[in-house]
């Protein structure tokens, strides 16, 4: 296999003794073999990476792989190609497949079919059978088969007793429960954020209360049970305040926000572009700023894409009947860096995309989990270059800053 000598590349990894240094890196068989200022190899193909950075690959805690059951939207091969194009070397696959990932056999199906892909695809098992919110799954069996965590996303666990028992059940094997907090009875038929924008559009709104009321409930359950709880898709300022307080009380709680909530707000839906129809909905600018402040002070642990492939019949229809969802693996880095380059450091962005999500699921990056980044490159992603099978993104052909080079 060809060896490569990457010259004059800057290391961006807080765990490395070379962090912040310009080095040469020898790559053999796809792994880092040597790294240092004096590394040379006459037999290797030499590439000058002046101005670029060597960093651990990104990790996404919320990806819909759609395999098995919805392969017309995405499959394991296509999602792996989309992930690696966006710099993600590890992705966590939600249980929202058909059949739902709720047994040892279904966990093994994903792991076996992902073996020959360029990324690590880690299955998340369901908390309740068929997402019914009532009947617990065999979480222990799935854990031993390789499930990385347990979640009913895109649903919330509506029954408090079920979530309480799940938090207790997974503690002996240090399991993680992931939840997307929302009260379905308060969401109803809502389409967009409840505000002046929803009124002007004539659309039913989704209140902040529908989210933060469940955050409050889940935190109280965590106080009672102990264990570990991760909130995905936090979108409101009130939720951020509650999680900040819970962390101050030393509860074992973490949270992530979605890329689109950081880079877009509710004003994007005014023109009824269904590609901006996501759940939770895009919120106000004040909510968005609260999320950014949460990134800065550590309330928000990481950023996820909520990669949700949908085909044209599910998305390019009237706004009210369009499905919720957006693809995001390939544009995440360019969107985030463009939006946040004056708000957070490069090191902080790497924590949010790489170190922290791995810490939440007790994973570490291997010597093969590296990517090469150029923070200054401006580019756009045309539809013809998308690796995903689906095209449901409002960020195609829009200016991005920061590109994954390899």
Where do the model's predicted regions map?
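His/Asp/Glu-enriched, well-ordered alpha-helical/loop segment
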Residues: 200-226, 296-297, 302-304, 308-373
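Histidine/acidic residue-rich metal-binding segments in metalloenzymes
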Residues: 137-303
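C-terminal cap of metal-dependent C-N hydrolases
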Residues: 9, 318, 367-406
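Divalent metal-coordination and catalytic microenvironments
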Residues: 9, 30, 51, 62, ...
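A glycine-rich helix N-cap at a beta->alpha junction
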Residues: 113-126
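Metal-associated gating/positioning segment near the N- to mid-region
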Residues: 50-114
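Active-site metal-binding motif and surrounding structural segment of the metallo-beta-lactamase
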Residues: 38-54
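N-terminal metal-binding scaffold of metallo-dependent hydrolase/deaminase domains
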Residues: 1-41
């Amino acid at each position: 296999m060809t060896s490569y000598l990457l010259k004059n590349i800057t290391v961006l990894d807080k765990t490395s003794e070379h962090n912040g240094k310009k080095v040469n890196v020898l790559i053999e068989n796809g792994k880092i073999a040597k790294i240092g200022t004096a590394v040379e190899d006459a037999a290797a193909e030499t590439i000058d990476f002046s101005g670029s950075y060597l960093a651990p690959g990104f990790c996404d805690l919320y990806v819909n792989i759609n395999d098995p059951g919805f392969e017309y939207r995405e499959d394991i091969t296509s999602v792996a190609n989309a992930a690696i194009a966006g710099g993600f070397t590890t992705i966590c696959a939600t249980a929202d497949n058909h059949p739902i990932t709720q047994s040892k056999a279904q966990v093994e199906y994903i792991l076996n079919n992902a073996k020959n892909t360029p990324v690590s695809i880690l299955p998340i098992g369901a908390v309740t059978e068929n997402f019914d919110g009532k009947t617990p799954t065999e979480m222990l069996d799935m854990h031993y088969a390789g499930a990385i965590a347990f979640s009913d996303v895109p649903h919330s666990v509506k029954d408090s007793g079920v979530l309480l028992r799940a938090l207790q059940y997974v503690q002996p094997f240090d399991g993680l429960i992931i939840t997307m907090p929302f009260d379905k009875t308060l969401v109803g038929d809502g389409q967009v954020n409840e505000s002046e924008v929803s009124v002007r559009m004539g659309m039913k709104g989704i209140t902040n209360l529908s989210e933060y009321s469940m955050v409050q409930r889940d935190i109280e359950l965590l106080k009672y049970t102990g264990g570990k709880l991760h909130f995905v898709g936090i979108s409101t300022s009130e939720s951020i305040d509650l999680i900040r307080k819970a962390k101050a009380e030393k509860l074992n709680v973490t949270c992530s926000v979605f890329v689109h909530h950081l880079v877009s707000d509710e004003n994007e839906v005014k023109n009824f572009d269904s590609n901006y129809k996501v759940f939770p909905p895009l919120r106000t600018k004040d909510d968005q700023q609260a999320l950014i402040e949460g990134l800065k002070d550590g309330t928000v642990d990481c950023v996820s894409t909520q990669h949700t492939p949908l085909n044209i019949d599910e998305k390019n229809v009237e706004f009210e009947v369009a499905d919720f969802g957006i693809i995001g693996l390939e544009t995440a880095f360019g969107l985030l860096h463009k939006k946040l380059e004056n708000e957070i450091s490069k090191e902080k962005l790497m924590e949010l995309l790489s170190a922290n999500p791995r810490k939440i699921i007790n994973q570490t990056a291997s010597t093969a989990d590296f990517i090469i980044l150029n923070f200054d490159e401006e580019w756009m992603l045309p539809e013809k270059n998308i690796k995903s099978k689906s095209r449901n993104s409002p960020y195609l052909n829009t200016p991005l800053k920061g590109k994954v080079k390899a």
